[in-house]
């Protein structure tokens, strides 16, 4: 299991003021980077070829996966977090044609939430990512056992 406290991408200082000034789309843009780095960090072990890393990461950073993970997080979110999610979801532009608009919007809300937590509450972000990591590792283990 990844030790999130030692993860190199967690902020040293939170910045709630900066987060309040950012648009939901900007939070989502930032959250997308946070999430992809988190996913890459998870799949670094065990060592494997770069192509295998890439396929695993792509499978988990897709809008469909992000929307599914938001469904998992939903019951664990505070009212304020759900507000950030909704703002991100509602700010989403039309996504790629391969993804239904509802899924794309939900993924954008998920990214906005992660971006917001990165800037405002690193401990909460750590808790959220730890919960996601449990689900991701369980999915990977189930897929490998087939």
Swiss-Prot record:
Cofactor(s), names only, from the UniProt record: Mg(2+)
GO molecular function, one term: rRNA binding
GO cellular component: a single term: cytoplasm
EC number: 3.1.26.-
Biological process per Gene Ontology, one example term: rRNA processing
Gene: mrnC
Positions annotated as active site in the UniProt record: 32
Entry's family note: Belongs to the MrnC RNase family.
InterPro entries: Mini3_fam, RNase_III_dom, RNase_III_sf
Keywords, comma-separated and alphabetical: Cytoplasm, Endonuclease, Hydrolase, Magnesium, Nuclease, Ribosome biogenesis, RNA-binding, rRNA processing, rRNA-binding
Subcellular compartments: Cytoplasm
Function (record text): Involved in correct processing of both the 5' and 3' ends of 23S rRNA precursor. Processes 30S rRNA precursor transcript even if ribonuclease 3 (Rnc) is inactivated; Rnc processes 30S rRNA into smaller rRNA precursors.
Organism lineage: Bacteria, Bacillati, Cyanobacteriota, Cyanophyceae, Synechococcales
Organism, as annotated: Synechococcus sp. (strain PCC 6716)
Protein name: Mini-ribonuclease 3
């Amino acid at each position: 299991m990844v030790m999130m406290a030692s993860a190199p991408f967690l902020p040293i200082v939170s910045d709630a003021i900066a987060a309040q000034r950012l648009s939901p789309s900007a939070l989502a843009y930032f959250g997308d980077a946070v999430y992809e780095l988190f996913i890459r960090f998870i799949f670094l072990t065990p060592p494997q070829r770069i192509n295998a890393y890439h396929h695993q990461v792509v499978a988990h950073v897709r809008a469909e996966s992000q929307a599914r993970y938001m469904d998992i997080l939903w019951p664990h979110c505070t009212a304020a977090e759900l507000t950030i999610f909704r703002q991100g979801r509602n700010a989403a532009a039309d996504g790629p044609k391969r993804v239904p608009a509802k899924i794309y919007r939900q993924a954008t809300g998920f990214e906005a939430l992660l971006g917001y937590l990165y800037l405002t509450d690193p401990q909460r972000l750590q808790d959220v990512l730890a919960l996601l990591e449990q689900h991701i590792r369980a999915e990977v283990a189930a897929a490998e056992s087939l």
